[in-house]
Swiss-Prot record:
Name of the featured protein: von Willebrand factor A domain-containing protein DDB_G0292740
Domain VWFA: 346-515
Organism: Dictyostelium discoideum
Region (Disordered): 297-318, 703-815
Record field: compositional bias (Low complexity): 703-719, 750-802
SUPFAM superfamilies attached to this UniProt entry: vWA-like
Biased segments, Polar residues type: 803-815
VIT domain boundaries: 63-194
Compositional bias of kind Pro residues: 720-749
Length: 910
């Protein structure tokens, strides 16, 4: 947990109120490594000018973005007040933004602007107050909503439209149309529902500075009501000391935080509130109940009455009681011994074999792979890809189980790797990997090693971000010419790690650091058993909708959040609430020791909250599931269900929008002035899915990520040349040409297609290295492209190799450590025959107790030799020796012999 997190309020309950001390200290960049912050990180990369970014968040003339504001008169749409009323529970955050604007234009106005909307968030309500009346937005099919908006404007009425950005970049589009001049102030209410941000074992409430309009002075106020199921250990505020806090109970599970400030043109810092909770190593639950009768449906201002059939269906459904359940879990694995970890996993390694990797880089990569393949164990599946202008792979059919046969194949494959595959096209091998169905028993982890840039970085990062629920990515950037933002962006898009390797001679050590993180304890193949809840339905058909349907493996220092909704007849609802005992839901998962674990979660249906926030969030997560299915299948069934859920829970989505129209008492006849905040040719930020909680080192939280931050600062220091122009399609450039990261997309956001990946010449000096600039545009899903050239495995006579050898065939190595590791079997042992020449004297001294198991003695000798001779290179051999120790202990246990005793004996003989 955050080391310097200090409790702001150890005293004070009930009406006692305190000003927050300004001395609380937090590592300033720590929260920026959280998965949820990746959205804002990309926002900052694409809009580094804070003034420009904040102008987008407010209403102003289009030229306001490009010229000095003093050159304009006051014909503007001005914000005069901005307040946020938020409610936070264990998993869910509900925010009501209230913004009051004054139209000082001399002509009717259509104002257009976009609000950044995190992938964790959606809009669930929208209303407008003007001329003494309040108009509520109604959810409609997006096409119908746009038509209704256009019709209202054409007839001289007022209209307001809220919708998700059509280009899928997670912006919220907001249009106010036909507002007459000198009108009284207009107040907009926008309700947003969001999954709470988390980092390590803390919950985060963040208001990013880009959300605050850049305008003349206006009042801002924040009220945050907190209701948690667990006691609050400490609260951290990153901001000025004008915050105040009031606890509402002695258990410190409820509190209210308030903040007021005058904002304007000055630089605005992020507002961050961090909650550290008491540790509970079991899943927590939060229950919400809704009981809606027919009269409620009839009077609901948000309900859409496009069709009688929809109304009747909604009425029928809402005669029942509806429950929403939120489950969250932050497991801890502090007591697990590393040698005992025996979890399943799929490991896929992608090696850049383009021309610029020739020489030391590819030699180091090959040596690193020789160590890596000995560090895996028999619980793994694995594969290796070499990519350049095309790609090839060790196993054409996909990842294979790790055993002596597959190890022999890969050993020969690795020995023939060379930098002979031309350019750098990474998208096609990534597509090949992600097109294969995930095996939930084997969490998929991808390791990418590259020294350059790709021609389609934006598509690549956007594509992999869609698979963050199934895949974790680790990236290695080699040398000074690497596209740093490619390295960082890929890893963060899928909640992994990255490292930047300036000197290829350090590659083996750096590669093993990330591989060690991939072997940290994990809960995988997670599922929930809701059968006890279903049993209480008295035989009536009952459906529980869980979202997300596919649960991401819970890697070390990550938090799981899962939601479920269930609708019951009122008699069944009463039966469950009066059951007398909590209902048990069982969470099942494959544990880090190789066993199947079960966690019992108690659902106390007597202790529920009467609100709709979890219902709405559960529906939003379900819509996200459906949108992902639709992306892959393009079937209309998902679209129809998305629209149905959007209407039922009043949610803006890809296919639904909120629209408000009003007939004007005096139809507007003047020409309407369009105030466009974001011009069509401006560059839109990429929004990368939930990169959510940043994994940390198993032994020392934050240590590794702090090293990464410092490493990137050192790596970037002093190098800031502008990116060179991206090359268009065509033949490879002449030798000596300089390549770099692609430039920002042209107007419209599209990149030109390139068949050759550009890369800097490896001969360039480090001063030519490009800084981490990210010029990306998130578009609709990638359409299937023509198959890439699938090159045959390098220098192999046939892709179908002989699997007859039960032990790896290794090529001689000048590195004595690698030479020893190359003789290791898949189970971690060394055979007597494989080390006879090197250990002939020591082998002859085999203890009598081990005479029947000669390979055990041989393995102990090699372990002892490695530990003694290569102690300074422990990071390279640690995983290999761990599986060797495990194998030896298993054999000695059968003989009722002591591991420590015979290890000491072996050490004395080497």
């Amino acid at each position: 947990m955050i080391k310097n997190l200090i409790s702001a309020f150890s005293q004070g309950v009930g009406i006692q109120k305190k000003e927050l001390p300004s001395t609380i200290i937090l590592n300033k960049d720590d929260y920026k490594e959280a998965n949820y912050y990746n959205y804002y990180r990309n926002l900052e990369l694409n809009k580094p000018d804070e003034v420009l970014a904040r102008r987008i968040a407010g209403l102003a003339p289009i030229a306001y973005q490009y010229y000095n504001v003093s050159s304009f008169d006051n014909n503007q749409f001005k914000i005069v007040d901005f307040s946020i009323d938020s409610k936070l529970n264990d998993t869910c955050l509900t925010c009501v933004w209230t913004q009051t604007y004054k139209n000082e234009s001399k002509t009717p106005v259509e104002a257009v602007y976009r609000i950044p909307l995190s992938p964790l968030s959606t809009v669930s309500a929208f209303s407008v107050q003007f001329n003494g009346k309040t108009l509520h937005g109604k959810i409609k099919d997006s096409t119908k909503a746009q038509e209704k908006y256009d019709d209202a404007i054409a007839s001289g009425g007022q209209a307001f439209l809220a919708e998700k950005s059509k280009d899928d970049d997670n912006y919220f589009n907001f249009k106010l149309g036909n507002i007459p001049p000198t009108e009284s102030s207009i107040t907009i209410h926008i309700t947003m529902i969001s999954e709470i941000g988390s980092h390590l074992n803390s919950l985060h409430y963040l208001l990013h500075r880009y959300c605050f309009p850049q305008s003349s002075n206006y009042n801002f106020s924040l009220s945050l009501s907190v209701n948690l199921s667990n006691s609050i250990k400490s609260i951290f505020f990153d901001g000025d000391k004008s915050h105040s806090l009031q606890y509402e109970n002695k258990e410190k599970t409820k509190c209210i935080i308030q903040y007021k400030k005058s904002l304007g043109f000055n630089t605005q810092p992020n507002i961050l509130i961090v909650f550290e909770l008491d540790d509970l190593n079991k899943p927590q639950s939060f229950i919400e109940k809704l009981s809606i009768n027919k009269e409620d449906i009839k009077n609901n201002p948000h309900s859409d009455s496009d069709s009688d059939s929809d109304d009747e269906e909604n009425k029928k459904e809402n005669e029942k009681s509806s429950y929403a359940i939120a489950l969250n879990f932050f497991p801890k694995f502090e007591s697990i011994n590393k040698e005992d970890i025996y979890q399943k996993g799929e490991f896929i390694f992608l090696i850049d074999c383009s021309g610029s990797m020739s020489g030391n880089p590819i030699d180091s990569a090959r040596r690193a792979l020789e160590i890596i393949i000995r560090s895996l164990n028999e619980q793994c599946k694995f594969n290796i890809y070499c990519f350049g202008s095309g790609f090839n792979k060790a196993f054409q059919e996909g990842s294979r189980k790790y055993d002596d046969d597959s190890l022999a194949v890969v050993n020969r494959y690795v020995s023939n790797i060379s930098a002979n595959l031309g350019g750098t096209e990474l998208l096609q091998p990534i597509k090949d990997i992600l097109s294969k169905e995930i095996d939930p028993e084997y969490p998929r982890q991808i390791f990418i090693l590259t020294d350059g840039a790709v021609s389609d970085r934006s598509k690549l990062i956007e594509f992999v971000s869609k698979e963050s629920k199934t895949t974790r990515i680790f990236t290695y950037g080699i040398g000074s010419s690497v596209d740093v933002e490619l390295v960082v962006g890929l890893s963060k898009a899928c909640k992994g790690y990255y490292t930047l390797i300036r000197n290829s001679s350090d590659m083996e050590t750096e590669v093993m650091k990330l591989l060690s993180i991939a072997f940290e304890p994990t809960l995988s193949n997670v599922s929930f058993d809701w059968s006890q809840l279903l049993d209480l339905s008295n035989g009536k058909s009952t459906t529980i909708i869980q979202s997300p349907t596919q649960i991401r493996p819970i890697f070390n220092n990550e938090r799981m959040m899962v939601y479920a909704t269930i609708e019951l007849d009122n008699d069944i609802s009463n039966n469950i609430e009066n059951h007398g005992q909590p209902v048990i839901v069982t969470m099942n998962a494959d544990g880090p020791l190789g066993d199947r674990l079960s966690y019992h979660v108690e659902l106390d249906f007597k202790n529920y909250s009467q609100s709709n926030s979890i219902h709405t969030l559960a529906a939003f997560k379900r819509i996200q599931d459906l949108e992902e299915i639709e992306r892959k299948s393009s079937k209309e069934t998902e679209k129809l269900e998305i629209i149905k859920l959007g209407k039922k829970y009043n949610l803006v989505s890809k296919h639904t929008s909120l629209v408000v129209t009003s007939d004007s008492d005096s139809p507007t006849e003047d020409t309407m002035k369009v105030i466009n905040i974001l011009p069509n040719n401006s560059q839109h930020p990429i929004i990368v899915d939930r990169c959510h909680t940043f994994a940390v080192n198993f032994n020392s939280p934050l240590q590794y990520q702090q090293q990464q931050q410092q490493q990137q600062q050192n790596f970037n220091s002093g190098f800031a040349p502008p990116p060179p122009p991206m090359m268009s399609s065509g033949p490879p450039p002449p030798p000596g040409s300089s390549f770099g990261a692609p430039p920002p997309p042209p107007p419209g956001g599209a990149f030109p297609t390139s068949s050759i990946s550009e890369k800097k010449s490896s001969s360039q000096s480090s001063s030519s290295y490009l800084p981490p600039t990210m010029s990306l545009s998130r578009k609709s899903s990638l359409s299937p492209s023509s198959p890439s050239k699938n090159y045959p495995s390098p220098k192999l006579s046939s892709p179908s190799l002989s699997y007859g050898s039960t032990q790896s065939e290794s090529t001689p190595s000048n590195d004595p450590l690698i030479s020893l590791l190359a003789k290791q079997k898949a189970n971690g042992s060394w055979s007597k025959s494989s080390i006879q020449d090197q250990f002939s004297s020591a082998i002859s001294k085999i203890p009598n107790e081990l005479s029947a198991v000669e390979d055990v003695w041989a393995t102990l000798l090699v372990i002892s030799k490695i530990m003694k001779t290569f102690a300074s290179q422990k990071s390279k051999w640690e995983l290999s020796v761990q599986k060797s120790n495990k194998w030896v202990k298993q054999q000695l246990l059968k003989l009722n012999l002591s591991f420590d005793q015979f290890l000491e004996l072996a050490k004395s003989n080497v």
